[in-house]
Amino acid sequence: MSNQDLLYRYLFEEYEVRGELVQLDHTYRHVVEAQSYPVQVQKLLGELLVATSLLTATLKFEGSITVQLQGDGPVRLAVINGDNNQQLRGVARYEGELPSDGKLQSLIGNGQLIITITPEQGERYQGIIALDADTLAGCLEHYFAQSEQLATKLWIRTGYHQGEPRAAGILLQALPAQSEDHSADFDHLTQLTATIKDEELFGLEAEEILYRLYHQDKVRVFDPQAVEFRCTCSRARCEGALLQIEKEEVLDMVQELGKIDMHCDYCGAQYQFDGIDVETLFSRAPDNDANKLH
C-alpha cells in the first residue's frame, strides 16, 4: 500500500448514504511507540485513533474532537484528540495486570465513553456514553443514534500488515431524513461493507477497497485528506508552566534534583532545565509577578 495515513470521504449517488474510510500507519506507530504500550493498550489506542479520525471528518467547522475512555479497570484512561485538519495525538494510563482477552469492558471496567467537540468559534459540546456495547464501534453507534439520530455503522480494525501495526476503519451514515424511508438502502450497504476483511483494510489502496465493496453501485469518491500525528508540546510551553511557579520554588527543585525534567506523554519528548536555564527564564520574563498564580 503506497498511500498511507489517508482519510477518504465518499457518497453513494443512488442512495442517501455517505461514507468514510481511513487507513493509519505512521500515525498509529507514533502514538503507540511514544510510551512502549502493551499490545492490549496499543489495540485500544488504535481503535480510538480510527474513531477520532472518522468523527473529526464529520465536523462542518474548524475545531477539535476528543474521544476518551475512562473507568475503574486496568486501563484508567485512554484518550485521542484530533482536529479538522486530521492532526491526531493520544495517550493512555494503565496499571496492574492487563487481561489477555483485550476486550473493552475487561480493560476499562465500569466506565464511560466521553466525546468532547470543541469548535474554534462557539460553545463546546460533550456527550457521555455508557459502555453498553461489546466494542468501541458499538458504543459510537449508540452515540450517533442518541445525539444525531442518524443511522450510523462503524467498522474499526487494528492489527498487523507485513509486521507493522496498522489501524483502519469505515463509517457509513444515512444522510439527514428525506421524505422517503431509505432504511433498506442503508441495510443493503451495511451488508456489503460487513464483508471487508482485515487484510484488505490494511493492505489495499482505498480505491481498490471501495471498488471491491461497492462495484455494483455508483460511488463518488472525494480527494483524500492526509492524517498525521501532531503534538503541540514545546520548550516554550514548558517555560510557561514553570513561570506559573515561584522562582525560589523552581530553584529549590533544581537544587534537590540537579535539574528539572519535563516529559511529554503524547510524543515522548524530554525538556530539561538546569539552574542557569531557570535564572535566564525568569530574568527575561517581562513581569514575573504577572506570570504567577496566587
From Swiss-Prot:
<dbReference type="GO" id="GO:0044183">
    <property type="term" value="F:protein folding chaperone"/>
</dbReference>
<comment type="function">
    <text>Redox regulated molecular chaperone. Protects both thermally unfolding and oxidatively damaged proteins from irreversible aggregation. Plays an important role in the bacterial defense system toward oxidative stress.</text>
</comment>
<keyword id="KW-0862">Zinc</keyword>
<keyword id="KW-1015">Disulfide bond</keyword>
<keyword id="KW-0963">Cytoplasm</keyword>
<dbReference type="Pfam" id="PF01430">
    <property type="entry name" value="HSP33"/>
</dbReference>
<dbReference type="InterPro" id="IPR016153">
    <property type="entry name" value="Heat_shock_Hsp33_N"/>
</dbReference>
<comment type="similarity">
    <text>Belongs to the HSP33 family.</text>
</comment>
<keyword id="KW-0143">Chaperone</keyword>
<dbReference type="InterPro" id="IPR023212">
    <property type="entry name" value="Hsp33_helix_hairpin_bin_dom_sf"/>
</dbReference>
<feature type="disulfide bond" description="Redox-active">
    <location>
        <begin position="264"/>
        <end position="267"/>
    </location>
</feature>
<feature type="disulfide bond" description="Redox-active">
    <location>
        <begin position="231"/>
        <end position="233"/>
    </location>
</feature>
<dbReference type="GO" id="GO:0042026">
    <property type="term" value="P:protein refolding"/>
</dbReference>
<keyword id="KW-0676">Redox-active center</keyword>
<dbReference type="InterPro" id="IPR000397">
    <property type="entry name" value="Heat_shock_Hsp33"/>
</dbReference>
<dbReference type="GO" id="GO:0005737">
    <property type="term" value="C:cytoplasm"/>
</dbReference>
<dbReference type="GO" id="GO:0051082">
    <property type="term" value="F:unfolded protein binding"/>
</dbReference>
<dbReference type="InterPro" id="IPR016154">
    <property type="entry name" value="Heat_shock_Hsp33_C"/>
</dbReference>
<protein>
    <recommendedName>
        <fullName>33 kDa chaperonin</fullName>
    </recommendedName>
</protein>
